[in-house]
A protein has these predicted regions:
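Transmembrane beta-strand segments of outer-membrane beta-barrel domains in Gram-negative
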Residues: 1-126, 205-210
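C-terminal transmembrane beta-barrel domains of outer membrane proteins
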Residues: 26, 72, 90-239
């Protein structure tokens, strides 16, 4: 932010939670977490409109949020959290989350994430599906948002929002097979390998407002529903 690049907006949230976690499976591949505690959300305005240095662009305004105190309960099940599109480990991973809030802010929210990745030599294939649903009357900060920095590149920042959403992402990565060894600087200092490669990624997302109340929240956020499946693709060089 000091250099004028702050591409996100924020909610002032404070929590005091108790967490209990239990590992599952012989190799602790699964995790079951239960969280419960007090939370407080506050709608805040940015204190700075832009960086104090004459660099970059003005900061984003924070999107509308409903202030309130509430008791938050979360149950999360994860299987193979080490399997992700961003990592090289192959396999199948799953994450299921249920969240409930009671108090000045009230809502229920459920999310599911399913990831698969396979490596074949220098070729890596991966896919990830995210689905979610929240209460139509949930505060705006609990709605699902899609856009440039939210798993749907090629569209505006948080262009789409709603109380029901799904995003499917696929990726094909091909390494060039060069510069794959770590770089030795000194006897004790090594740098990771450059390992260049090319990646093709495809994203498809859908979000809707299930009730007039949900649509009113989408309008207040300055977003829109997708209306139909929106997609984008990118070809990038990675190191």
């Amino acid at each position: 932010a000091l250099f004028g690049r702050d591409e996100y907006d924020y909610v002032d949230r404070r929590t005091a939670m108790l967490l209990v976690q239990h590992f599952l499976g012989t190799d602790w591949q699964g995790q079951l977490r239960v969280e419960s505690g007090f939370a407080q959300d506050r709608d805040v305005r940015p204190r700075w409109a832009e960086s104090p240095l004459p660099l970059g662009s003005p900061f984003r305004d924070n999107r509308p949020a409903t202030s309130g105190d509430y008791w938050r309960n979360v149950v999360t099940f994860e299987w193979r959290p080490d399997v992700a599109l961003e990592f090289l480990r192959p396999g199948v991973g799953t994450k299921l989350t249920y969240e409930r809030a009671d108090g000045q802010l009230r809502y229920e929210r459920a999310e599911g994430r399913f990831t698969v990745r396979q490596n074949h030599g220098r070729l890596a294939l991966g896919a990830r599906l995210d689905v979610g649903i929240t209460s139509p009357t949930a505060p705006p900060q609990q709605f699902f948002e899609l856009g440039a920095n939210q798993n749907l590149p090629g569209y505006d920042y948080k262009q789409f929002a709603g109380d029901q959403a799904a995003v499917l992402r696929g990726q094909v990565y091909r390494g060039f097979g060069i510069f794959g060894a770590p770089l030795r600087i000194t006897q004790r200092v090594w740098l990771p390998p450059i390992a260049p490669g090319v990646a093709l990624s495809v994203q498809a997302g859908y979000v809707r407002a299930s009730t007039p109340a949900a649509q009113a929240t989408v309008n207040a956020l300055g977003s829109e529903v997708t209306g139909h499946v929106r997609s984008s693709a990118a070809l990038t060089l990675r190191f």
